[in-house]
A protein has these predicted regions:
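A contiguous, surface-oriented mixed alpha/beta subdomain in the mid-to-C-terminal portion of proteins
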Residues: 1-120
Length: 120
């Protein structure tokens, strides 16, 4: 399971990518009820694509991947369309913004669209 906290922010070692998809899936199951409406196969395929997209863009921090996945899989949108919104992509890729700051930015972005991250 993924826990978003200031102490959890660090660049991942290459071995950590091996189970990243499983950890993010567990976190999304807890944070996003609509995520459970997808089949296990759909979730696996979609997460694989989003993680590959994040890696290609240079993401290296677990919480960045988790927040990026949450943003991409909100109900009512195609994740590729959301990803292509320039300000979303730029904000999530900033290397000098810590996860709590990204979480605050994302929380505001979600609130504008009527969503809220549980426990934040």
């Amino acid at each position: 399971m993924i826990s978003i906290s200031p102490s959890g922010v660090s660049a991942m070692q290459s071995g950590r990518f091996d189970d990243l998809q499983h950890r993010i899936d567990g976190w999304l199951c807890a944070e996003l009820p609509s995520w459970l409406k997808r089949t296990v196969g759909q979730r696996k395929d979609d997460l694989h694509a989003v993680i590959a997209d994040g890696r290609e863009a240079g993401m290296r921090v677990e919480t960045d991947f988790a927040l990026y996945a949450l943003l991409m899989f909100l109900p009512g949108g195609n994740w590729r369309d959301i990803r292509d919104e320039r300000h979303v992509a730029e904000a999530m890729m900033l290397p000098d913004v810590t996860a709590p700051n990204k979480l605050m930015w994302l929380e505001g972005w979600l609130a504008e669209r009527g969503h809220q991250i549980a426990g934040v």
